[in-house]
Amino acid sequence: MVTSVKGLAYPKHVTEDAETLARALNDAFGVHLFLDYGGTLVQSGAASRERPAPHVRRKLERLCRSDAFFVYVISSKSVHDLRELIGVPGLGLIGQGGLEIWEDGGELEHPVDIRHVDR
């Protein structure tokens, strides 16, 4: 069975699961939400400087204002590029495939495997 939501057709189990998830998240607190930039916030294979659509930015802003969520965007792009492209207050960024981590208002971190640190 297929259900139509906002003009898009989804198998019924997808919309039922989404509704169940939405109900669970209504009562959630401290949820860490990780979103991929390419293919999630912008189309996969999109131009390297493409910004998320205005409705996507508004949803990110709303999530970041909520006390229930910690929202991060993950990308192979640098944190610097992500900050310029997205620019949503309160959004955490993970760039270079995890080599850079930045939380709004914090310092840029470069995690290093302890095995590679001179002792």
Map each language-model feature to its residues.
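Non-catalytic pre-domain segments flanking phosphatase-related domains
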Residues: 1-37, 41-42, 48
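A short acidic, helix-capping loop that chelates divalent metal ions and anchors anionic groups
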Residues: 42-44, 102-103
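Active-site phosphate-binding/coordination module
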Residues: 51-119
